[in-house]
Amino acid sequence: MISMNRLSILLFVFAFGLTMMSNTALSYKHSVWIRNFLHEKNDLIIHCKSTNHDMVYHRLHPTGSYHLLVDDDSDYFWCHLWQGPNFKHHQVFGVNHGDVWEAREDGIYFSQIKYARDLRQHVFMYGWNVPLTLSRASSLGLCCVSLSLLLSSLVLFYFYLVLVLKFIFFIMNFKNLIFICVGIFLFSL
């Protein structure tokens, strides 16, 4: 039989292991990289934050990278980027759904490592100094919007078609019911 002392040590180790697992393995974090692909001597200033975390300002020299760990279960992260003379060009965007972001002269590019075998296959997302609603949206974002609109319109069409068919079926059955009632009435005379 296990002594009480050994049992308490075993329970303590088990509880400690569960606590460590809940802080590491069970809370999934993914990496977000922001890279400066601007021309020579054109630094990039990055300020990433969320409602609970402020990652302070970082200055990236050309070809430099900034790494951010984002917890999937936590709040929404977004980043401000500034570049150009006196850092007058600016853009802000959400980074929760992206693995690699590149700042280039014409705007911000995006790529997901798990889908892009070649890291040079980035998609243009946002232009500098352009509001997000006016900026060229990513093909991924437009696909999601168009697919959701298509899906919702198909669902609405399906319900409309079912409603029309049920109404036609009801009218057809109602006509048959009238004919049966008239036939019974005439037969009973």
Curated annotation (Swiss-Prot):
GO CC terms of this entry: extracellular region
InterPro entries tied to this protein: Self-incomp_S1
Main localization, broad class: secreted
Keyword Manganese: no
Keywords linked to the UniProt accession: Secreted, Self-incompatibility, Signal
Keyword GTP-binding: no
Subcellular location: Secreted
Signal peptide: 1-25
Domain of life the protein comes from: Eukaryota
GO biological process terms on file: rejection of self pollen
Family: Belongs to the plant self-incompatibility (S1) protein family.
Protein known as: S-protein homolog 26
Organism: Arabidopsis thaliana (Mouse-ear cress)
